[in-house]
């Protein structure tokens, strides 16, 4: 597995800009606060897995033409993607990318460091706990390992993580615009 440095940095900046525009970087946004938000997203992976909420890619292909505009995309996303394990994987990665940009900006380096998921991690809960207990932190090395771990875990779960990160970024940006229109 090889992480795409340029793509990850682009996403990190995009996510950080969206988060800042939405006011998600207020006075409470310390590193500890951001790590706690990542932990809550990891918990949502466990919840989605427990409820067996998975994204069905065939539905996307079926309705792709009908959701060409932003409104159609948001409706589709809300109905078919929200609260799936696939979306929660993207949410964890986006929180990690936001933390990476917040802490390290352009100095962030992405590497996979030959990461593996330990053999004792057989269930979703065990993998989630390993991520939180053994990998998570705000250092360059820790964030990079967490992203690599998420890609490896997504691969095991047959989740197209790039697809879900791109779509969640689009959704977040559209929700940001909608929020501004309503206020």
For each feature predicted by the language model, list its residue ranges:
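Flexible "arm" and connector segments at domain edges
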Residues: 1-183
């Amino acid at each position: 597995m090889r992480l795409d440095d340029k793509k990850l940095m682009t996403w990190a900046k995009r996510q950080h800009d969206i988060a800042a525009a939405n006011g998600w970087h207020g006075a409470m946004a310390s590193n500890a606060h951001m790590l706690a938000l990542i932990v809550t997203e990891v918990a949502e992976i466990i919840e989605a897995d427990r409820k067996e909420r998975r994204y069905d890619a065939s539905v996307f292909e079926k309705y792709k033409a009908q959701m060409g505009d932003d409104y159609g995309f948001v409706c589709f996303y809300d109905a078919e993607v929200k609260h799936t394990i696939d979306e929660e994987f993207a949410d964890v990665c986006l929180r990690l990318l936001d933390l990476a940009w917040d802490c390290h900006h352009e100095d962030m380096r992405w590497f996979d460091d030959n990461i593996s998921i330990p053999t004792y991690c057989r269930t979703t809960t065990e993998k989630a706990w390993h991520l939180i207990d053994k990998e998570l932190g705000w250092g360059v090395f820790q964030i990079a390992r967490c992203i690599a771990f998420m890609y490896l875990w997504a691969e095991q779960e047959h989740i197209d993580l790039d697809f879900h990160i791109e779509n969640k970024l689009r959704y977040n940006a559209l929700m940001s615009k909608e929020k501004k229109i309503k206020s």
